[in-house]
Amino acid sequence: MVRSIMLLALFLAIKVSAQEVGSFYEKNTALNFNDGRNIAGEIAQPSGFNPNFHIYLCFGQSNMEGNAKVEEQDFMGISPRFLMMAGVDMPNTGRKEGKWYIAVPPLCRAWTGLTPADYFGRTMVDNLPDTITVGVINVAVGGASIDLYDEDKTDSVIANSADWFKGFCKDYDNQPLRRLMELAKKAQQVGVIKGILLHQGCTDNGQKTWPSRVNLIYTRMLNELGLKAEDVPLLVGELLTKVDGGCCYLHNSIIDNIHDYIPTAYPISSLGCPGKPDKLHFTAEGYRIIGKRYAERMLQLLKY
C-alpha cells in the first residue's frame, strides 16, 4: 500500500512538472530576453587550424537555450579569446549561421537570454593560458525532450508537439542535432572539440531511461565527429533544485548518477543557483553560477 502511494506521488510529480514546461511556453509565446540590445560581437573568423582553439558543443532545452534577461553586466568584459559560432542567422544583429563572433550574448538564437555557456566560456578563458581561445556552439530548444536529439525520433517528436515548439525547431530546419553536427564539423577545421555541455531534463523529469538515451546521442555525436569519449567529456547540469524552488528536482537524482551510466559524463551541481518564479528556469545570477561550475569541472578534467 505504501509503495503504491509512493509510486502514485512520483507519477503525479513527473506529470505536473511536464505540464509546467508546456504551460510556460503557452503563456509566453513571444519571448525576448535582450530587448533593445543589438550587439553582434566583433566578427572573429579564425584564419586556419589552431590546436589551441578549444571548442565546446552545447545542447539541451530552455535552460541551455537561455531563459533569463541579459543584464548590463553580461555585456561587459568579454574576452576576445571567448568566441561563439552562430547556430542560426540572427537578423537583429547581422550574425550569420556558421560564423564566429566574440561571445556577446545571446549565444543561442536572436531572442534567447543568458545561458550556462556564457559564464562557462568566460571562466574558462580566465583560467587557461593566454594562448588558448575558447569557442562555444549552442543549439538548444526550449521544451525539448532528449528524444528531439535522437534522429530516429526527431520527426515524430516535432510532429506531436505544440505549435510554439515547432516554431523553435523550424529555426534549425527541424533537425537540431544535424545542425549541431554540421557546425561542429565546420569548427573542427579551425579547432579541437574538447567537451560537450548538456542541460536538459525538465520535459523528461524522473524518467529512468534518460541516461541510456543520453548515452546513445553522446555516442553518436562522438562517432560522427571522429572523437574519443576519454578526450571529450560530457558535462551534465542539474535542474533547479527543490531547495531553490524547482519543480523538476526529481531528475537531479538521475543526473547525479550519470557517471555510473556514462564513465566520461560528469554532473554539475545547481544547488544555490537562484530560480525564477516559474520553478523551471534559473535567474541571470543562477546562470552565471552554474556556468562557472561547468567551467570549474572542465578545468579540473583538463588539469588546470
Predicted regions and their residues:
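Bacterial Sec-dependent N-terminal signal peptides
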Residues: 1-20
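Cell-envelope and extracellular/periplasmic
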Residues: 19-304
